[in-house]
A protein has these predicted regions:
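Structural motif
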Residues: 3, 51-59, 66, 133-141, ...
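Beta-propeller fold detector
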Residues: 4, 13-17, 66-105, 148-158, ...
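Acidic, small-residue rich beta-repeat scaffolds with periodic aromatic anchors
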Residues: 1-7, 159-207
């Protein structure tokens, strides 16, 4: 058990609410998409209620990886008793959440979360989602603080016209493919295509 719904924060700020004047109740009827980081130290979690979604990052307790070594016991002794102890330890592990802390990342209204992806070093979290116009979009966050990285996808690619899809990524950069939404007028063919996004520089360049 990584985390239970009871361990999810009860309320949080929307990142689009720049003044942070008020919190909103966190949607937590059920779990949505989740994603484990490449190092195994973080897991991104979605909880949802109808058309609302909440993203958080749980930090994994590394010591659980040593369960096998810690349950082998000393040499000799009663093998049945040792086996019973190992079973008990395993049951305790599975019953208890192994997340050491949970940080809120963001809340979304009128969207469907499609995918959560950590970069290789787990420094950043990429969130792919469908907005209220059924257009695929994305946001990028610092996975330790939960802060939104201000990469201006919306001014470059209109939210109601252009899909943004993750293709691949390296350490602190990734490639996206921009396509037009079907049955939409006034599409600029110069905008569609592949781009490189540099997270540190917060730049988007066509390739």
């Amino acid at each position: 058990l990584i985390i239970s719904l009871n361990n999810i924060p009860k309320d949080a700020y929307l990142k689009e609410n720049e003044l942070m004047l008020y919190k909103e109740k966190v949607p937590n009827d059920k779990f949505g998409p989740v994603s484990l980081g490449y190092k195994g130290t973080k897991i991104a979690i979605t909880t949802i209620s109808e058309n609302r979604a909440f993203i958080s990052v749980a930090f994994i307790q590394e010591s659980k990886e040593t369960l096998g070594a810690s349950t082998q016991g000393a040499e000799g002794g009663n093998s049945n008793q040792q086996g019973n102890n190992e079973t008990s330890d395993l049951e305790d592990l599975l019953d208890k959440p192994i997340a050491t802390k949970v940080i809120p990342v963001d809340m979304y209204n009128d969207v469907k979360i499609d995918n959560l992806v950590f970069t290789f070093e787990e420094r950043y979290l990429i969130v792919e989602y469908f907005n209220s116009d059924s257009v695929k979009r994305m946001k990028v966050y610092n996975s330790t603080s939960g802060d939104l990285i201000e990469i201006d996808f919306n001014s470059k690619f209109a939210e109601d016209k252009y899909n943004i899809e993750l293709v691949d990524f390296k350490k602190d950069e990734f490639n996206i493919n921009v396509t037009s939404k079907e049955d939409v007028n006034n599409i600029d063919s110069e905008i569609t295509g592949k781009y490189k996004v540099e997270i540190e520089e917060k730049t988007i360049k066509k390739i």
